[in-house]
Amino acid sequence: MKRKIILDCDPGHDDAFAILLAGNNPEIDLLGITVASGNQTLEKTGKNALNLVQYLGLDIPVCLGAKNPIIKEVEICDAIHGETGLDGFDFPPLKIDYDKRSAMDFIIESILSSKEKITVVTTGPMTNLALAIRMNPDILNNIEELVLMGSSCQNGNVTPAAEFNIFCDPEAAHICFNSSVKVTMVGLDVTRKVKVY
């Protein structure tokens, strides 16, 4: 049986690979992509997600989520991912559009309506998931696990201690980490070693 996942991201080159891999893995049922600000503004990360979904020929919804973190101001990472958040490739003109639901509504509806538990994979700040949990805590009963790219068991990449995705919205991370959901963390100690051939 395919594993049902929702991919919550802020594309970004790293998240582009996540979309490519999740969207083409025969063992995964990618229900949809929810987008937050992070690597760039929400307008740019959302457009990047749409471009990737169209380019890869995926038939899944892309839902815009939180424009800002729960408390602090948005901080982007244009020094790494460029002005567009996905510099280095020119996509053809967009012919698809966003799903009308917000990321939070999509997360809630998908999880509550599923007969099987859903895995939520976050590769950016966890704002959308945290807000969905606060909006409807019942979703916690039907989440298999949260798999996140974030945090670190050693040093940070934004400050000596802080990793970017957690740094962007620490309050969202706090909500997710303190929920009843099983958490699998893929931190900097892992992501710094990944080789893509």
Model region roles, listed by residue range:
Residues 1-197:
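N-terminal acidic, glycine/proline-rich low-complexity segments
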